[in-house]
Amino acid sequence: MATPHINAEMGDFADVVLMPGDPLRAKYIAETFLEDVVQVCDVRNMYGFTGTYKGRKVSVMGHGMGIPSCSIYATELIKDYGVKKIIRVGSCGAVSTDIKVRDVVIGMGACTDSKVNRIRFKGHDFAAIADYKMVKAAEEAAKARGIDVKVGNLFSAELFYTPDPEMFDVMDKYGIVGVEMEAAGIYGVAAEYGAKALTICTVSDHIKTGEQTTSEERQNTFNDMMIVALDSVLLGDAE
């Protein structure tokens, strides 16, 4: 039962899907952390895989860059394939001195300059938030592993190359823990279709200081984020 953008059959996906932006990162996650992996889709080279993590069936699929792209994949996964939970795992930029490069952050909510949630919410502001139990499970998973995480609001930007850098000062004032491009869209889609969602990000660069991670450092901290995400799935099952 293929959709316009996913050529998988019903039952190919687990009820929980981890979603990085990069489809090659999805492949890395599947090959590194999952067992008994099967590739289930590849339309537009947006790869999806299903395997097991400590015996638990889990899927992983790329979502591309930006709210329009991730919203398409999240909608089809939830509406057409019966996915119940989505965990976005990606990178973000920091704007606060309290947030350091290589930190792992959990987005309990997502502000945005996109109008996408106003469009779906009849012109009104929609509070795009993560599922509380998923946030709690991720915090507990991180604590059990000794991985420090920061929890707060993300900012999902429409533009990567912004013409308004002064907005970063406003974000800092309001305590934004990371700037990325998808969480608000995924949270909106999950709310619209009765699913649950969470975003966990690794800070890859600091917008204010210009500090950036090397590719090796990104990989190491990304692995911490992935362990938190996968362990949180198991904790969520135990509730």
Curated annotation (Swiss-Prot):
Catalytic site residues?
205 (proton donor)
Keyword line: Glycosyltransferase, Transferase
EC code? 2.4.2.1
The reaction(s) this protein catalyses: a purine D-ribonucleoside + phosphate = a purine nucleobase + alpha-D-ribose 1-phosphate; a purine 2'-deoxy-D-ribonucleoside + phosphate = a purine nucleobase + 2-deoxy-alpha-D-ribose 1-phosphate
Q: Name one GO cellular component term.
A: cytosol
- The region annotated as signal peptide is none
Q: Does the keyword Protein biosynthesis apply?
A: no
Q: InterPro entries, per this entry?
A: DeoD-type, Nucleoside_phosphorylase_CS, Nucleoside_phosphorylase_d, Nucleoside_phosphorylase_sf
Q: Which CDD domains match?
A: PNP_EcPNPI-like (cd09006)
One BP term from GO:
purine nucleoside catabolic process
Entry similarity comment: Belongs to the PNP/UDP phosphorylase family.
Job of this protein: Catalyzes the reversible phosphorolytic breakdown of the N-glycosidic bond in the beta-(deoxy)ribonucleoside molecules, with the formation of the corresponding free purine bases and pentose-1-phosphate.
| Subunit architecture | Homohexamer; trimer of homodimers.
Protein name as catalogued: Purine nucleoside phosphorylase DeoD-type 1
This chain's source organism reads Vibrio vulnificus (strain YJ016)
- What gene name is given for the protein in this entry? deoD1
